Amino acid sequence: MPLGPEERRFVRLIWLLYSTNPYPPSGEGTARQRRRARRRWRQQQDQIRVLVERLQEQVYAVDRLADEAQHLAIQQLPDPPHSA
């Protein structure tokens, strides 16, 4: 299924968030600083997961609409009368 502009924006955002949010290094800073870094990282990962779920919901909604549209049929209409 081709992605629309909104879905492409979500995919780019998710990719950017994942690529710019590495797990915090261990061994740097005090224990409190490391805990805070891990907490911030988890919060950012939760935001990414919310975006991914939102994107998946939209994709499923579009798929359902496409399935429903396949069941629709155009009513057969008679040909228009020809002028003589």
From Swiss-Prot:
Subunit structure: Homomultimer; when bound to the RRE. Multimeric assembly is essential for activity.
InterPro entries the UniProt entry points to: REV_protein (IPR000625)
Gene Ontology MF terms in the entry: DNA-binding transcription factor activity; RNA binding
Main location: host cell
Primary role: Escorts unspliced or incompletely spliced viral pre-mRNAs (late transcripts) out of the nucleus of infected cells. These pre-mRNAs carry a recognition sequence called Rev responsive element (RRE) located in the env gene, that is not present in fully spliced viral mRNAs (early transcripts). This function is essential since most viral proteins are translated from unspliced or partially spliced pre-mRNAs which cannot exit the nucleus by the pathway used by fully processed cellular mRNAs.
Keyword Mitochondrion on entry: no
Location of this chain's protein in the cell: Host nucleus, Host nucleolus; Host cytoplasm
UniProt keywords, alphabetically: Host cytoplasm, Host nucleus, mRNA transport, RNA-binding, Transport
Region (Homomultimerization): 13-21
Name of this protein: Protein Rev
Positions of short motif Nuclear localization signal and RNA-binding (RRE): 30-46
Any Pfam family the entry gives: REV
Name of the encoding gene: rev
GO BP: any one term: mRNA transport
Motif, Nuclear export signal: chain positions: 65-77
Coiled coil spans: none
GO cellular component: host cell cytoplasm; host cell nucleolus
Domain notes: The RNA-binding motif binds to the RRE, a stem-and-loop structure present in incompletely spliced viral pre-mRNAs. This region also contains the NLS which mediates nuclear localization. These overlapping functions prevent Rev bound to RRE from undesirable return to the nucleus. When Rev binds the RRE, the NLS becomes masked while the NES remains accessible.
Organism: Simian immunodeficiency virus agm.vervet (isolate AGM TYO-1) (SIV-agm.ver)
